Design a protein with these regions (language model features):
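Generic secondary-structure signature for well-ordered alpha-helical cores
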Residues: 47, 51-54, 75, 100-107, ...
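Short beta-strand segments
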Residues: 10-12, 61, 112-115, 145-149, ...
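Short, well-ordered, mixed-charge alpha-helical segments that flank or form enzyme active sites
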Residues: 119-123, 152-157, 184-185, 209-210
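Conserved donor-nucleotide/metal-binding helix-loop-beta segment in metal-dependent transferases, i.e.
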Residues: 122-154
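Catalytic core of tubulin tyrosine ligase-like
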Residues: 159-241
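Conserved N-terminal catalytic core of the sugar/cofactor nucleotidyltransferase
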Residues: 1-10, 18-25, 36-115, 121-127, ...
Length: 244
């Protein structure tokens, strides 16, 4: 039985410019069946999280221009689960906006935030890590990211350097490094202290909102006044009018 306090936010608003010409602005990569499975990357991501998150607790944040594509590919998702961005503002506003919305639904919510375009081969191990991470953030006011043990020096990924342990298989983060040069990537891998940054995050909703208020006060000041709109049928109309 899935935990009703657990939520998922799938970020699906990118235009996938690095995969041009396969991925285009009108049909970006998350809506494509890249691997011939019969399911797009977005659909595979939804299917994956549906195994550990209640269906009604999975939200898709996407650009308003992709609303019809999301509805077509995920007919089991209600309109209230599709949060439409009026403009692309990158990750922080996307996460903060979804968090305010989810807190209005459930002030005890634990959230996993995931890109819509990941390929996951060891799905059982992945989902076990997600469940363990959500349990951790439900008991700890920490921001959690999922690291992947590197098997080669890769310059296309970000790296996380771990610090002291914070529990079994949990570590404090010492540094983040975005896409290092090859020689530095080799040093990272050989040290055993670095993990690839997966781009997946987990936290309790109150923890992330407090972090937004403390670290991004200008952003939080724009989102906090919407408390009467979040978790209502006004959210779609408001999101298409207001630019953050």
């Amino acid at each position: 039985m899935t935990n009703q306090d657990n939520y998922c936010v799938i970020m699906g608003g990118g235009i996938g410019s690095r995969f041009w010409p396969f991925s285009r602005k009108t049909l970006p990569k998350q809506f494509l069946d890249f691997f011939g499975t019969g399911r797009s990357l977005l659909q595979q991501t939804f299917d994956r999280f549906q195994k550990v998150i209640p269906t009604e607790n999975i939200f898709i944040v996407t650009n308003a221009m992709y609303a019809d594509l999301v509805k077509e590919q995920l007919p089991e998702v209600s309109e209230n689960q599709i949060l439409l961005e009026p403009a692309r503002r990158n990750t922080a506003p996307c996460i903060a906006w979804a968090s305010y919305h989810i807190r209005a639904l459930n002030p005890n919510a634990n959230i996993v935030v995931a890109p819509s375009d990941h390929l996951i081969l060891k799905e059982d191990e992945f989902l076990a890590a997600i469940e363990k991470g959500l349990d951790f953030v439900s008991r700890s006011a920490k921001l959690l990211t999922l690291g992947i043990k590197p098997n080669r020096p890769e310059t296309g990924y970000g790296y996380i350097q771990i610090d002291e342990p914070a529990g079994e298989n949990f570590y404090k983060v010492k540094t983040f490094t975005e896409k290092p040069e090859l020689e530095l990537a080799k040093v990272f891998v050989e040290s055993g202290e670095f993990y690839w940054n997966s781009g997946l995050f987990m936290w309790n909703v109150n923890t992330i909102i407090k972090a937004s208020e403390d670290l991004l006060p200008e952003l939080a000041s724009k989102l906090a006044p919407g408390k009467d709109v979040y978790a209502t049928d006004k959210i779609g109309r408001a999101s298409c009018r207001e630019r953050v």
